Amino acid sequence: SCEGVRGYVYVDLKALLSGGFYSIPDLYVDVLNVCIGSGNQGIYPFNWRLYPTDQDVTSFWSSYYTTMMHINYAIRHMDAAYEYLTPDEQKKVDVYKGEMYFFRAYVMHRAALLFCEDYDPDKAADQLGLPYPKEWEPEAKLARGTLAKLYENVEADLVEAEKTVTAQGTPTDQIYLTKDAITAFRAELALHLHQYTEASQYAQSLYGTYPLVTTAEGLERMWREDTSTENILQLEVLRTTMTTVNSFGSYLNSSWKPNLGEYFYAPTYIPEQHIVKLFKDADFRTDIFLVKNANVTISGNKGVGVLIGKFRGNKNFQTNTTTLVYRNRPKMFRISQMYLVDAEAQYRLDPAKGLDPLNQLRTARGLAALAMSDVEKDVTLLDGTKISGLFNAIQEAVSYTH
């Protein structure tokens, strides 16, 4: 069925937005440190030793292009079924095809962030791109082409998507693609392509619809219950389907000690010290994003440390009150990301204005506004996006206030 092949692609996207697809890039850019008991998981990205035969590199490549194959198969299947559908069914399938065009653009952009040079408008016609399959041809051997051509294809697919995906979106944890989600992606894409005025405009157009969280309770619900007015697109996951997303257990690997009434941890990865220092005791994000004074045992060595707590998982997926599941509904787009896009874009246009959206985000999180002179070097916490932000000035200066 058309709904079936559509659903399969959504499952692929959930996998691409969880687990190692976040942690491996963060290892590469010194957000995380590898522990001695890791069994060498992630050690090559951590040491900046990237080889085409490395399992992390090959699994990323394979996952992105398997998803592309499923997207193109879905489009082909929908085209073949179209004449046999009722008019009402055809209207639905038109939307489904629009979703597939969007996901094709999104997946190729995500792959380009990892496998291509940073986009340079003056050099893109000569920079290597990636194969951009548009047909279901599993055995095809496509040329990489240029980065300029890749983003021409991305734009063409977005235009196709916008023809049929017209549902506006609401701040109610949308699980399927909306017009607002496309706008959010256009904001991120415009920033990457150095189209700063457009990036700012796209981002700002969503502010009025998706209110920022302003309390610790609201932020905790975002990560422990997967519900928030900030979610522009959050893919559906249930307790019965939570294995469709990858685990973040490597940040904690917790075990509950009932006789002591507390957790003990054996993490694979821990945050770098410069990340820990970004959080102050008065910051209401601290107890949500970090586990402080954690009892840690690594390869027989016991101590107390600070761990990543952001991905404890949705507590409604737990079968009891103490066994953490380390899985969440993937948040493809959130309004807080739009404030960061806007901040970066405005900074590029006029450094004096770059702090305006950043400070709106900071004050919503209960933090003091910053002056340009006291902006701290900061990063986005564990969203796997820092690797693509290495070339962005203000992303080197914003805290993961979202």
Where are these regions (language model features)?
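Acidic, glycine-rich segments characteristic of secretory precursors and extracytoplasmic regions
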Residues: S1-V29
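Hydrophobic-face positions in mid-chain alpha helices that act as interaction patches
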Residues: G4, S200-I335, L367-E376, G384-F391
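Short, surface-exposed recognition loops and adjoining beta-strand edges that mediate ligand/DNA contacts
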Residues: F21-I36, E117-D126, A167-S250, S373-D378
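Conserved, well-structured interaction surfaces
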Residues: Q41-F115, G145, K163-T166, T323-P330, ...
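TPR-repeat structural position
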Residues: Y196, P351-A352
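Conserved small/polar residues in nucleotide/adenosyl-binding loops
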Residues: T401-H402
